[in-house]
Amino acid sequence: MRVVVLGSGVVGVTSAYYLARAGHEVTVIDREAGPALETSFANAGQISPGYAAPWAAPGVPLKAVKWMFQKHAPLAIRLDGTQFQLQWMWQMLQNCTSARYAVNKGRMVRLAEYSRDCLQALRAETGIQYEGRTGGTLQLFRTQQQLDGAAKDIAVLEEANVPYELLMPADLARAEPALAATSHKLTGGLRLPGDETGDCQLFTTRLAALAEQLGVKFRYNTPIDALAMEGGRIAGVKCGNEMVRADNFVVALGSYSTQFLSGLVKIPVYPLKGYSITAPIVDAKSAPVSTVLDETYKIAITRFDDRIRVGGMAEIVGFDKKLKQARRETLEMCVNDLFPGGGDTSKATFWTGLRPMTPDGTPIVGRTPVSNLFLNTGHGTLGWTMSCGSGQLLADLISGKRPAIQSGDLSVHRYLGETAGQTRPAYA
């Protein structure tokens, strides 16, 4: 079958690769000049299935109020003047219960664990290189309350059979030797030895090249205007004066998916603004060896070959992509506090991107009420972590194969109430 994939970020490119490997004729369309030039360009770099968890969690509403008065707050909110933002935040609040958190985290871990398995198989099959490391990830706690609170996450990890280690301050240097100098600031850590790291932009670029070898056509610098309906199905996508036709269509447009699908399928995907800096390593012994996550500031610090990537934070501010110096200062403070002398932050590049977030944290992957329209979006801060599994899952669905994991609760239908064949929008 002919399949058009809209979007060439890591989610779009993995979708195209797995579709091509399944024997489909695939075309990828993107407005940018190449793959992974927006949200996938400079993310935090961790592939963390075990840490897959929704931002909508018990206690977050109260924390959000406190964060409003903190200089280095991990979350910031500014009204963007749209009703959609208010609706999205309200639905996110409804997911901040213990019961909803457990359900949402459970399905996120399910997809993320499967995705890591798919990535490992892909790496073994192709030999793709992307400055990846398989040294696990380490979540660091600065307070006793954070350490005690890890018990809830550990329960979910045990239920999903995810290996873990709960480390005391004296043990942290076993996982990250450079923390020997700063472990006195910490109360402990949760290590997941099965997690990985890597440069998402490098991976996406090289996977796109592999996809081309399988026959995938990439059309860059191409406007994506609208989907055209004929007889209850998608007939094609309007790209300027051209209509590109296919049998099936995949929307992998990240935060822009919601507006693009307006009037066709209503999805609650909102841009969650994040920041990163990338600093050259000046002392390898003082730098991390894998990924460290600072629970207090919600910041990830990741080691690439000769660089340190520091990324995180979340701003609910719409499509504002301005770089804020205060956010850079927070990222620099965090990495210099934990790994002083490891990298030269004065020479770091500064970046921001918009992560496509759903109010429950789970991405939207799968079928829609339109028979030949499929979605692969809404991965939030876990697009890199979940990309391969989402791409394989989508390829299986389009190919008519039974997916390797439960997938019904990952589709858009969890937001849609269907009665007598009629679909009610998520916010009707």
From Swiss-Prot:
Tell me yes or no: is Transferase among this UniProt entry's keywords. no
Q: What is its EC number?
A: 1.4.99.-
Q: In which pathway does it act?
A: Amino-acid degradation; D-alanine degradation; NH(3) and pyruvate from D-alanine: step 1/1
Write down the chemical reaction(s) this protein catalyses.
Answer: a D-alpha-amino acid + A + H2O = a 2-oxocarboxylate + AH2 + NH4(+)
A GO MF annotation of the entry reads: D-amino-acid dehydrogenase activity
Coiled coil (residue ranges): none
Give the UniProt keywords, A-Z. Answer: FAD, Flavoprotein, Oxidoreductase
Q: Name one Pfam family in it.
A: DAO
One GO CC annotation: plasma membrane
Which top EC class is named for this enzyme in its record?
oxidoreductase
**Does the keyword DNA-binding belong to this entry?**
no
Matches recorded under InterPro entries: DadA, FAD-dep_OxRdtase, FAD/NAD-bd_sf
**Needed cofactors:** FAD
What is a biological process (GO) this protein takes part in?
D-alanine catabolic process
List of residues binding FAD: 3-17
According to the lineage, what is the superkingdom?
Answer: Bacteria
Q: Family assignment?
A: Belongs to the DadA oxidoreductase family.
HAMAP family the record matches: DadA
| Described purpose of this protein according to its UniProt entry | Oxidative deamination of D-amino acids.
Protein name from the UniProt record: D-amino acid dehydrogenase
Species annotation: Paraburkholderia phymatum (strain DSM 17167 / CIP 108236 / LMG 21445 / STM815) (Burkholderia phymatum)
